[in-house]
């Protein structure tokens, strides 16, 4: 039963297939997630499961959260996350139960959510891949300027969504349809083909793929 799991990005490496091909993989360290609460349609209006992962010193846990963890009978974690589940899956879960990497298997396709690396305030060339203007031929100040951002008196404004300079990165991002290459249950590791959002050590959420791409689709 694959619901999802919260882990930490440990870095990237590569593994070799039986025929010697090199496959780049991201290593996700996912210690057992502890169920802290089960959402039910009768009480909450939907079915879901709330989990915590990792650990946190008692003096760093607020009293409300300490009581929440104590009521579930689990050790305090570094945060809480929630997964939507079907009514049937919710029945099989209860507070205190653990979710491990063994809920996934090699060859399975997953979606991974994380917070992308923050790049600070970036211009349009770096942020949106705009082409630069001429280096010479009368251009002396606008080499990396975006150019026109609108029209004239009509409409007399800049349209929403216009690609301009601004904060780059540090946003919640999801990469879809990544293949699980290997599951190491002994060391609580998931090896996923390709790269995932975020810096090394950041939290990532691994879920079964919602819209799995079939072979041959472009």
UniProtKB/Swiss-Prot annotation:
Spell out the InterPro entries in the cross-references. Answer: Ribosomal_uL3, Ribosomal_uL3_bac/org-type, Ribosomal_uL3_CS, Transl_B-barrel_sf
Q: How is it modified after translation?
A: Methylated by PrmB.
UniProtKB keywords: Methylation, Ribonucleoprotein, Ribosomal protein, RNA-binding, rRNA-binding
The entry lists its GO molecular-function terms as: rRNA binding; structural constituent of ribosome
Q: Which family does it belong to?
A: Belongs to the universal ribosomal protein uL3 family.
In terms of HAMAP family, this protein maps to: Ribosomal_uL3_B
Kindly provide the name given to this protein in its UniProt entry: Large ribosomal subunit protein uL3
Organism ancestry: Bacteria, Pseudomonadati, Pseudomonadota, Gammaproteobacteria, Chromatiales
């Amino acid at each position: 039963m694959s619901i999802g799991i919260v882990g930490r990005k440990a870095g990237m490496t590569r593994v070799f297939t039986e025929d010697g091909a090199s496959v780049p993989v991201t290593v996700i360290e996912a210690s057992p997630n502890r169920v802290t609460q089960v959402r039910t349609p009768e009480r909450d209006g939907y079915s879901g499961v709330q989990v915590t992962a990792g650990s946190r010193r008692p003096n760093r846990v607020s009293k409300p959260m300490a009581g929440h963890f104590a009521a579930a009978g689990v050790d305090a974690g570094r945060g809480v996350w929630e997964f939507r589940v079907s009514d049937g899956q919710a029945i099989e879960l209860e507070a205190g139960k653990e979710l491990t990497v063994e809920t996934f298997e090699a060859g399975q396709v997953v979606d991974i959510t994380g917070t992308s690396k923050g790049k600070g305030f970036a211009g349009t060339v770096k942020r949106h891949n705009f082409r630069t203007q001429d280096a010479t031929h009368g251009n002396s100040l606008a080499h990396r300027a975006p150019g026109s951002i609108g029209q004239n008196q009509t409409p007399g404004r800049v349209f929403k969504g216009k690609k301009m300079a601004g904060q780059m990165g540090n946003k919640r991002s999801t990469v879809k349809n990544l293949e699980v290459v290997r599951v190491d249950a002994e060391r609580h590791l998931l090896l996923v083909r390709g790269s995932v959002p975020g810096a090394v050590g950041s939290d990532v959420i691994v879920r079964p793929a919602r819209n799995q791409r079939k072979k041959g689709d472009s």
